[in-house]
């Protein structure tokens, strides 16, 4: 009786050990040694990916140089990360002559993201971005406070949208001068 229990216990333990080993992935390290590849649940990284998605959109959309093709290229890449609300904002700025003034004035615009706040308790995820814009002219620099809002929707990952989000309902809620100083 004891021997039978010991055999069944040993077989069961060996089976569970083998199952656990099958769930592990090993990677060959430059042809020399095996390393255990640690897998993570994709959902664990979602908050980090969301903030990086929003950060990347803002960098593409608000970093401008006095070059029409560079502006159009960045805006086109930003549109892969957002919906028509961002395109509508781009069209508004274009109709107001903003991009033409950047080009003709030989100005540059840089963005520095202070923080990205995402609410993951509701879906779509509410996002607020706090940033500073620097508009660099030949003789002066204008610093502006920028606050934007939007919502993130889960989307399919692609080469053009590696984080798998779409920024929707994008709007600028604050864009005011903080200071102007000479260069």
What are these language model-derived features?
Residues 53-64:
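Solvent-exposed, amphipathic alpha-helical segments
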Residues 1-25, 29-48, 69-183:
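Structured, amphipathic secondary-structure segments that form assembly/contact surfaces
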